[in-house]
Amino acid sequence: MSERGRVAMISEHANPLAFLGSEDAGGQNVYVYEVSTGLARLGYRVDVFTRRDSPAPPQIVRLAPGVRVVHIAAGPAEFIKKDALWAHMPAFMEGCRACIAAQRRRYDVIHSNFWMSGWVACELKARLGLPFVHIFHALGAIKRLEQGAADTSPAG
């Protein structure tokens, strides 16, 4: 199938290569994996930008035909709970922007996942002029309502 377009998928903590069942790795990781590989089967080229949480993998890993996972340095190259990642989002956004510029790839759309990636997508839209689509996966107000004091999401 011929190439239909390029998608920059922003997924700051849900790396599709993560070991499922480990801390902060579950349904959203599966979603990112399935959507990115599904888009590739339809002829799109997808780059999944995720925060480097280990020094081990190379910067770019081929996930499947037409799908690359791009590890962006933002904070230490170690696991950080997603609720503590906000402080690293400006560096993550700048790393995504710099990587896109260095690779000279033209994307047709940004697809962001989770609220922090949504912020990154808004910033990239302003800098690169790209449209974006977003999925929250969870809404803080609903989580707080259901989980009460057990919810560890940042207040806001």
Model-derived segments and spans:
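Catalytic cores of nucleotide-sugar-dependent glycosyltransferases that transfer UDP/GDP/TDP-activated
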Residues: 1-156
